[in-house]
């Protein structure tokens, strides 16, 4: 089986790429980082450090790499069985052109073997969004063929992969936690789903997408934002602060109550899932900076993301949300000179004030009780 994976960064190499290589898939990475591509092509392998109760080093072998915008990438799409991505939500639109060209070539070559495309991104139904970008770019006469011969398969992914530590002289080495979860929508495949250990099939993907978004992502973001407020450097430092931990756990319990109501998750099992995530945040081997985890606050405060979406669920089911509100207020205080969204957030708050700014970013009614609550907590944090 041949696969092309867009995104040779830490998540691509340490998570999806590793699972594919472990399944003996013939794997090529596509990226725009030329030094990374050169290193992959000269060495054909890299190491993954898996940290937890026991630390081990795995070697991923027999890999190659091409530039994301190259004709080599187009040619690979024309012959691949699987295309996966881990590029970040905002980059999906940028790789859609290469994918569209590859699908046109595949059609013109007369290939009828199924191709499945899976976006493995921190977003809800990312592959469906990628599909829309691709379909828009297809010339007339190709769309119908693509719909018939290509599966666009949504997924939920979960593995903490921090950036490479400063001072590491190996551009390809990557550190990941032991835990990983890759759940895909089995109803969207074209042909039979591939057998890849570590890839779980479900016909109820949204339950797992929201479970991850409302728990791991919600908790991670609030830990980062409260951690920065409390002057902590890392996620571990922040979650070991009892005040931060109480709010983070409380917020995950509030969002969890929405999941239990909406999808019928077992309350005891979900409580165990929350505790598992808290222990993952405490992992002493993962040096994950609160500033990194908190970046892109405008996206994280948008209506469909990890802070506002669970809050909307609590409003829908008339459930408590005080800790989620605290997390939202802390997100509004997030600052980073390196993050354009943080700079834009600060400017919005300066120009409009917290009430109008939060309403604009989140889509919440400026005159609603929850916005008033968030503004009160925000002001109290000054």
Swiss-Prot record:
<dbReference type="InterPro" id="IPR013118">
    <property type="entry name" value="Mannitol_DH_C"/>
</dbReference>
<dbReference type="InterPro" id="IPR013328">
    <property type="entry name" value="6PGD_dom2"/>
</dbReference>
<feature type="binding site">
    <location>
        <begin position="3"/>
        <end position="14"/>
    </location>
    <ligand>
        <name>NAD(+)</name>
    </ligand>
</feature>
<protein>
    <recommendedName>
        <fullName>Mannitol-1-phosphate 5-dehydrogenase</fullName>
        <ecNumber>1.1.1.17</ecNumber>
    </recommendedName>
</protein>
<dbReference type="GO" id="GO:0019592">
    <property type="term" value="P:mannitol catabolic process"/>
</dbReference>
<dbReference type="InterPro" id="IPR000669">
    <property type="entry name" value="Mannitol_DH"/>
</dbReference>
<dbReference type="InterPro" id="IPR008927">
    <property type="entry name" value="6-PGluconate_DH-like_C_sf"/>
</dbReference>
<dbReference type="InterPro" id="IPR013131">
    <property type="entry name" value="Mannitol_DH_N"/>
</dbReference>
<keyword id="KW-0560">Oxidoreductase</keyword>
<comment type="similarity">
    <text>Belongs to the mannitol dehydrogenase family.</text>
</comment>
<dbReference type="InterPro" id="IPR036291">
    <property type="entry name" value="NAD(P)-bd_dom_sf"/>
</dbReference>
<dbReference type="Pfam" id="PF08125">
    <property type="entry name" value="Mannitol_dh_C"/>
</dbReference>
<keyword id="KW-0520">NAD</keyword>
<dbReference type="GO" id="GO:0008926">
    <property type="term" value="F:mannitol-1-phosphate 5-dehydrogenase activity"/>
</dbReference>
<dbReference type="InterPro" id="IPR023028">
    <property type="entry name" value="Mannitol_1_phos_5_DH"/>
</dbReference>
<dbReference type="GO" id="GO:0005829">
    <property type="term" value="C:cytosol"/>
</dbReference>
<dbReference type="InterPro" id="IPR023027">
    <property type="entry name" value="Mannitol_DH_CS"/>
</dbReference>
<dbReference type="Pfam" id="PF01232">
    <property type="entry name" value="Mannitol_dh"/>
</dbReference>
